[in-house]
Amino acid sequence: MNFTKLFLLIAMAVLLLTGQSEAGGLKKLGKKLEGAGKRVFNAAEKALPVVAGAKALGK
């Protein structure tokens, strides 16, 4: 197989894999990750003032 045929084969594969498609399963995964991130952020928001207060008491 020469370089041109190999290049065209790889280019076609890339175009097929990166083409526009419906989100489907990736959208569900993204939503779950987003929810987990929000929960971590909210927990950190609540815990950081407590931790900062504990450090201030230890000085």
Curated annotation (Swiss-Prot):
One of its GO terms (biological process) is antibacterial humoral response. Residues 1-23 form the signal peptide. It holds the Pfam family Cecropin. It is found in: Secreted. Induction: Up-regulated following bacterial infection. Expressed in adults within 6 hours after induction and accumulates over 7-10 days. Its main location: secreted. Antimicrobial peptide. Antibacterial activity against Gram-negative bacteria E.coli D22 and D31, E.carotovora, K.pneumoniae, P.aeruginosa, S.typhimurium, E.cloacae B12 and X.campestris and Gram-positive bacteria A.viridans, M.luteus, B.megaterium and S.pyogenes. Possesses antifungal activity against F.oxysporum, F.culmorum and N.crassa, C.albicans, C.neoformans and S.cerevisiae. No activity against Gram-negative S.marcescens Db11, Gram-positive B.cereus, B.subtilis, B.thuringiensis, S.aureus and L.monocytogenes, the fungi A.fumigatus and B.bassiana and C.glabrata. This is Cecropin-A. It comes from Aedes aegypti.
